[in-house]
Design a protein with these regions (language model features):
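Extracytoplasmic gate region of multi-pass secondary transporters
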Residues: 8-62, 153-157
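Hydrophobic core of transmembrane alpha-helices in multi-pass small-molecule transporters
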Residues: 105-120
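Intracellular juxtamembrane helix-capping segments at the cytosolic ends
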Residues: 120-133
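Interfacial helix-cap and linker-helix signal at transmembrane-aqueous boundaries
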Residues: 38-39, 71-72, 160-168
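C-terminal ends and interior cores of transmembrane alpha-helices
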Residues: 87-102
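Cytoplasmic membrane-interface "Motif A"-like loop-to-helix N-cap segments
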Residues: 74-87
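A late C-terminal transmembrane helix in Major Facilitator Superfamily
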Residues: 130-166
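Helix-to-loop junctions at the C-terminal end of transmembrane segments
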Residues: 64-77
């Protein structure tokens, strides 16, 4: 209730959630559906296996998380690191959707790894969410923000399907 009865606090909370959405867009929609959707859509040369694509993405997530912490220490700013990672994610998504047609299966797995690296700012995302609020609601925000982000995958999927249907027809 304390999060929702103050407009400024609510929008701060909503912004914290929105920062984490690209992570699960990439992992929950793009990489998790590599074999069923993206391998055919991108005309991947070879057989893509979801488990392998997810493995490379999660290795990338781990690498990205380590480097996001190091970079935030060097830059002395978590916010700059999140913007840097979001920019890297945008570049990779543009490549993924518009320029990866006919990619080899090995190239696809490398791309999955890079997507993981680009979305490997989970620890910083949770830390930023926790630091935005005072002691009374910090625990609530720290626990619920990642849950809302993970829980958004069905909504992201429905929106993606809707937009795909609009652009294909």
């Amino acid at each position: 209730r304390m999060l929702f009865n103050n407009r400024e606090r609510f929008f701060k909370y909503l912004n914290c959630i929105l920062v984490g959405l690209p992570i699960w867009y990439f992992i929950g929609l793009i990489v998790a559906n590599s074999e069923l959707i993206w391998a055919n859509a991108l005309n991947v040369q070879g057989k893509v296996v979801n488990g392998t694509a997810l493995m490379y993405a999660y290795i990338g997530l781990s690498v990205g998380d380590v480097f996001s912490g190091i970079i935030s220490q060097v830059l002395r700013s978590r916010r700059k690191v999140v913007f840097l990672y979001l920019g890297f994610s945008t570049v990779l998504m543009t490549y993924y959707l518009f320029f990866a047609n006919g990619i080899s299966v090995q190239g696809f797995y490398i791309l999955s790894f890079l997507v993981g690296c680009a979305t490997g700012y989970w620890a910083i995302f949770v830390t930023i969410a926790a630091e935005q609020f005072g002691t009374n609601i910090r625990s609530t925000v720290t626990n619920t923000t990642p849950n809302f982000v993970r829980g958004s995958v069905p909504l992201i999927t429905m929106l993606f399907q809707f937009l795909t249907a609009q652009t294909v027809s």
